[in-house]
C-alpha cells in the first residue's frame, strides 16, 4: 500500500480534531478522549490529516478501510494502460511491397494502442539525400493518418531519421 496511516497509540499529537465513522465532526478532543470514544465503539482512531492544526483523526474500522484502499489501488492499476513503443525500420530506397508490409505492421501496432517509431537508417552516401527519407516517413504518416497522429515530426538523430506516431484516442 502506498500510504500507511498512523493509528491509535501511535498518534503523537496531544489534541486532535475528531470525525466519527459517519463523517460528523465531534470537535477538538484530547488524544486520550478520542481513543476512549473509538474504543467504546470498537473502532480505531486513524490520523488522516497529520499536517492540519490540530491534526485530523477519524474513527473507523482500520482493517476494513485498508482493504477498501487496496481494492481502489488495484482497480486504478487495472485501468492504467501500459503504452509500448514499437519500432518499424525502413530504408530510404524501400520497395513498394516492403513498404506495404511495414505499413501493415505499423497499423497493427497502432490499432493495439501502441506507439510506433518509424526509423530510417541512412547507409554510406545516402545521408546526402535526406529528403528521400523524409518522403518515405511522410508517406507512412499519411497512410496512418486515419488511426494515428504524428507525435514527433521526422527528425535526424545521427545517421537515423525517425518519426513517432501515436494512436488517436477516439479508437478506444
From Swiss-Prot:
It is found in: Cytoplasm. One of its GO terms (cellular component) is cytosol. Its main location: cytoplasm. It comes from the Bacteria. Keywords: Cytoplasm, Initiation factor, Protein biosynthesis. InterPro entries: T_IF-3_C_sf (IPR036788), T_IF-3_N_sf (IPR036787), Translation_initiation_fac3_CS (IPR019813), Translation_initiation_fac_3 (IPR001288), Translation_initiation_fac_3_C (IPR019815), Translation_initiation_fac_3_N (IPR019814). GO terms for biological process: ribosome disassembly. It holds the Pfam family IF3_N. GO terms for molecular function: ribosome binding; translation initiation factor activity. Monomer. IF-3 binds to the 30S ribosomal subunit and shifts the equilibrium between 70S ribosomes and their 50S and 30S subunits in favor of the free subunits, thus enhancing the availability of 30S subunits on which protein synthesis initiation begins. PANTHER family: TRANSLATION INITIATION FACTOR IF-3 (PTHR10938), TRANSLATION INITIATION FACTOR IF-3, MITOCHONDRIAL (PTHR10938:SF0). This is Translation initiation factor IF-3. It comes from Geobacillus stearothermophilus (Bacillus stearothermophilus).
